[in-house]
From Swiss-Prot:
This is Receptor expression-enhancing protein 2. It comes from Homo sapiens (Human). Belongs to the DP1 family. It is linked to Spastic paraplegia 72A, autosomal dominant: A form of spastic paraplegia, a neurodegenerative disorder characterized by a slow, gradual, progressive weakness and spasticity of the lower limbs. Rate of progression and the severity of symptoms are quite variable. Initial symptoms may include difficulty with balance, weakness and stiffness in the legs, muscle spasms, and dragging the toes when walking. In some forms of the disorder, bladder symptoms (such as incontinence) may appear, or the weakness and stiffness may spread to other parts of the body. Spastic paraplegia 72B, autosomal recessive: A form of spastic paraplegia, a neurodegenerative disorder characterized by a slow, gradual, progressive weakness and spasticity of the lower limbs. Rate of progression and the severity of symptoms are quite variable. Initial symptoms may include difficulty with balance, weakness and stiffness in the legs, muscle spasms, and dragging the toes when walking. In some forms of the disorder, bladder symptoms (such as incontinence) may appear, or the weakness and stiffness may spread to other parts of the body. One of its GO terms (molecular function) is taste receptor binding. It holds the Pfam family TB2_DP1_HVA22. The lineage of its organism: Eukaryota, Metazoa, Chordata, Craniata, Vertebrata. GO terms for biological process: endoplasmic reticulum tubular network organization; protein transport into membrane raft; regulation of intracellular transport; sensory perception of bitter taste; sensory perception of sweet taste. It is found in: Membrane. It is a multi-pass membrane protein. The gene is REEP2. Interacts with odorant receptor proteins.
């Protein structure tokens, strides 16, 4: 653990901060020799950082691994050993010169593919955002409409749902199953069957009498008295005058 902390401090201070300040001085003084020196160092240090990320995972268990890393950073930076310039001239520069065209092609393809991928992902993200916004707006409108219902409307809906279950006299209607049960019970009861066999005629006569009694006042009409007819003989006697007999006059 201590060796890991010391190695990190050495890499940050001697491998990063000091070369960064020296590069600033080279740019400020416009010293080409120093400028080239530190540019070679930064190229080698970039490869070292990439390899360090992998070796810390794979070789961290190796004995004296962190001590070797400290020694390597000092060897790169020391002006006596000039490790960065040696590695650059013998390994880095020849390899990059041979693979330069392929590396440029890979970079161009990666740039184009990354641009297309970003555009595709951006379009999908915009579509998803638009769909989410439309769905949220529809839910908001629906909730507002549901809230706009008054309590009176809700009670009316509740009463309309309860209407088919009530009779005209206000009592609840039985369910179909209970209705069938009551009918079967009535059919099984012998007393009720006897009553039903004897009562139909009586009920019919009573009903007919009641109907006749109800209908009689409707059919009855006031009877007008017919004028008495006078005998025709009396009328003829009144209308015809009496004639005097001629025989009686002659005799007189």
């Amino acid at each position: 653990m201590v060796s890991w902390i010391i190695s990190r401090l050495v890499v940050l201070i001697f491998g990063t901060l000091y070369p960064a300040y020296s590069s600033y001085k080279a740019v400020k003084t416009k010293n080409v020799k120093e400028y080239v020196k530190w540019m070679m160092y930064w190229i080698v240090f970039a490869f070292f950082t990439t390899a360090e990320t992998l070796t810390d995972i794979v070789l961290s268990w190796f004995p004296f691994y962190f001590e070797l890393k400290i020694a390597f950073v000092i060897w790169l930076l020391s002006p006596y050993t000039k490790g960065s310039s040696v590695l650059y001239r013998k390994f880095v520069h020849p390899t990059l010169s041979n693979k330069e065209k392929e590396i440029d092609e890979y970079i161009t393809q990666a740039r184009d593919k990354s641009y297309e991928t970003m555009m595709r992902v951006g379009k999908r993200g915009l579509n998803l955002a638009a769909n989410a916004a439309v769905t949220a707006a529809a839910k908001g409108v629906l909730s507002e409409k549901l809230r706009s219902f008054s309590m009176q409307d809700l009670t009316l809906i509740r009463d309309e749902d309860a209407l088919p279950l009530q009779r005209p006299d206000g009592r609840l209607r039985p369910s179909p199953g209970s209705l069938l049960d009551t009918i079967e019970d009535l059919g099984d009861d012998p007393a009720l069957s006897l009553r039903s066999s004897t009562n139909p005629a009586d009920s019919r006569t009573e009903a007919s009498e009641d109907d006749m009694g109800d209908k009689a006042p409707k059919r009855a009409k006031p009877i007008k008295k017919a004028p008495k007819a006078e005998p025709l003989a009396s009328k003829t006697l009144k209308t015809r005058p009496k004639k005097k007999t001629s025989g009686g006059g002659d005799s007189a």
